[in-house]
Amino acid sequence: LGYDDFFNYNKDFNIDETIGLGLSDKSFFRQAVPKIDKINKEHDKWYGAFLMLTNHTPFTDIERVSDYEVDFKYKMYNEEDGMYEEKSAPFLEGTKLGSYFKSVHYADQAIGQFMTDLDNAGLLDNTVVVIYGDHDAKIKAEEYDRYFNYNPFTDSVLTEDDEGYVPVDDFYYNLNRKVPF
C-alpha cells in the first residue's frame, strides 16, 4: 500500500483559519472535499487518510471557536418564592479537561459538516468512512477527579472522606483513556 498523492497542509491548502497546531479542522475538511471529488473522478477505487489537528493536545485556542459550555448545571431551591432556580458553575473553564471537551465538541461539528459536504457532493455512495483516535487525550487523573467530584454549592472538589466521592482509580482512569475503543 503506497501513496500516489500527498497533500501538505501548508502547500496544498489555504491556511485561512488556524487553531492550536495548525489549519482548523473545519477549514481543512471544507477544502478537502474538492480534492476528494477530483480523486474520485480519476480513480475507481482509492483510499484516503485525513489527520485532524484541532482536537489534539494541548487544545490551545479552542475557546476562540467553541461555544460549548463546560459548566455544571444544577437547580437550587429559592426559599423566598418556593421555586427552583437554574444555576451554573463554570467548574471546568480554564482547565485542560474543559478545553479537551470543547475541542471534542468542535471536532464533532467539523466531522458532521464534512459528512454533510461529502454527501451533498455525492461522495458517500459506495464509501466507507472510518474515524479513530491514535492516542488518548493525555489528561491527568486529577482533572477527572475534579470532573466527577465537583461540588457546585461549595465550589470545591470532594475528598475521599466526603459522602458521594467517586474514586478515580487506575482502572477507571485507564478505561477512560482507552483508544480507539
What are these regions (language model features)?
Residues 1-181:
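Solvent-exposed soluble domains appended to multi-pass membrane proteins
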